[in-house]
């Protein structure tokens, strides 16, 4: 056996006392040793304590520090660190977490040239106009100063006209400051008095509340059909969905915290990092069912944590996946790019302490970068339907044969006619033996549509999802009297300049309205950004980030931003006009008052919006929400509208200049494209042609079907005839009611089925009568014979 003194300290992992006797250990080397080695040394020394000499014991007692001699702290561990529970996670997470970002999307963002800078165009025009007005103003100020030395200030009618001209021109900001205090006091009085819908008994004027709509024959006729539950549909639901007893066998045991759900430690760390300590009701009900591998149809109010309800069980199941071969096992589909980007951010935050890989596949981002990521076979793909089909058909080495879980977020939107063909293409390609989960704030109850997804006895988990808003939301309505519909923009400008001045999302039905409002706000000096489908992805992300970071006060958006978008600190939502349906209204106003916070939703409604407003007020009353009428000064509104009307020529010039710059940019792009075609002709022609599952004609047809379902064909008829009469509106409402199949036929006393049967019977009788006439009296050919008999 070799003697111990020949060993070197660097060759041994554990040092013995004999080694220490022969080879003295330097202090620097001991201090540099990691804690693991020191712990093992301590264990060894305990075993050999009996053989140690008193001098050696004294030497060991001298080492009192944790890391080495002299107790020098090397800063490896924070002295204030504590293993915290719920309180620590809550304190650290909620205060430090700043919301969901777009880092995942920026990685795959294509390098694009900056588009037309609308702010720069507006700024140039304002400076030009301000330059002229300041020259006139300085001359007037000098004259006023000379007069002020000799005479007192007298506000007569002439002076009032001069002040009105100043206010009417470029002194917009000063007007807002002067009237701001008065308006704030009026707002506080209205909030304290709580101008409730039920107490609105004032005389008819422009300031009357829209929250108490007058009864209408169509409304009275449709109320009964809306409230009644179709027995046949209810029977279908019972046969389609799994019984509630199977979904939740132990109803008493409701999860009060994530610890009781037996989630893995990495997921618990991810939850603590974002400040999630207690599950929301939808999460407490759906996560245990999803962990069992069952299909789920979930619905809950906006801002209730539906994304976490399907992300958490997915992460928990993927922790136990086979890891030898990378495999794509989960696909999450969402209707809009922004919602998919946000879902990707939520998932990556929650999975920060796991080895689960995610890929974002949405339109507007680099196709090649996404293809490279898909070749690595990530565990989860978060995508929009169009881009997912593109990769499914055209990306090499990408297969969906191993997909085990499919999630449709905002499922009711995905089931509409606009997405029907794309969704059908995806569902027929994915494996049949999969777990499917559907979530939305306004989940459809139509079994016929849910059957298309291929669900297998799904568990129905509904938590306050019957088209309800949260109770912390104050809903305000501003009524436009007949004849004042053309002053809608004046009402909006008055609200934004005097009432709600920051963190406001304004929704429009059409892109052109949002863009025009963007120009008007710029001319009025209101900082804003727009968000709609005509913008490229870089511009869309930039607009959301500017609004989120507080660089702009208003976000002018279409319904592109109405679903799922979670922007921290949104105080107010304004509807420029009431949306097409109550479902869209619920999603719009759900951008504020999220996760228990307070918020305000204001809707500018005219007589044509009566039906949706009535439904919103009725739903709000049913759940005890606060419905408030907002009264505005018609004089100030008219003044603002006049100011906006006088801007029409300037607005048209700005839009024309913007159009010219876009055309120039397009020509430059075409020139660059031609140069690339010449330089890289062989490579471009050698690429395989990308394919799609439907023709251009089918694409247009599906888009039109989506528009018709959304607008109820009203907009198309408006384009043809200019304006819809009350008769046309009633006819379209009845047609929509029949198409939905949710109510009875109200035109007569008989049901629709009976009337169809009667019509069919009458048609059959008519055909039989015609056939009988043909058989009994055949038509004679030639001229009729004369009365005199045959000729001889």
From Swiss-Prot:
This is ATP-dependent RNA helicase DRS1. PROSITE patterns: DEAD_ATP_HELICASE, HELICASE_ATP_BIND_1, HELICASE_CTER, Q_MOTIF. It is found in: Nucleus, Nucleolus. Residues 17-30, 54-63, 70-98, 142-164, 175-205, 220-233 have a biased composition (Acidic residues). GO terms for molecular function: ATP binding; ATP hydrolysis activity; RNA binding; RNA helicase activity. ATP-binding RNA helicase involved in ribosome assembly. Residues 287-461 form the Helicase ATP-binding domain. Associates with pre-ribosomal particles. Keywords: ATP-binding, Coiled coil, Helicase, Hydrolase, Nucleotide-binding, Nucleus, Ribosome biogenesis, RNA-binding. Belongs to the DEAD box helicase family. DDX27/DRS1 subfamily. A motif (DEAD box) lies at residues 409-412. Residues 1-100, 125-258, 675-792 are annotated as: Disordered. It comes from the Eukaryota. Residues 675-756 have a biased composition (Basic and acidic residues). Residues 35-49, 757-768, 780-792 have a biased composition (Basic residues). A motif (Q motif) lies at residues 256-284. Its main location: nucleus. Its EC number is 3.6.4.13. Residues 633-681 form a coiled coil. It comes from Gibberella zeae (strain ATCC MYA-4620 / CBS 123657 / FGSC 9075 / NRRL 31084 / PH-1). ATP binds at residues 300-307. CDD domains: DEADc_DDX27, SF2_C_DEAD. SUPFAM superfamilies: P-loop containing nucleoside triphosphate hydrolases (SSF52540). The Q motif is unique to and characteristic of the DEAD box family of RNA helicases and controls ATP binding and hydrolysis. It catalyses: ATP + H2O = ADP + phosphate + H(+). One of its GO terms (biological process) is gene expression.
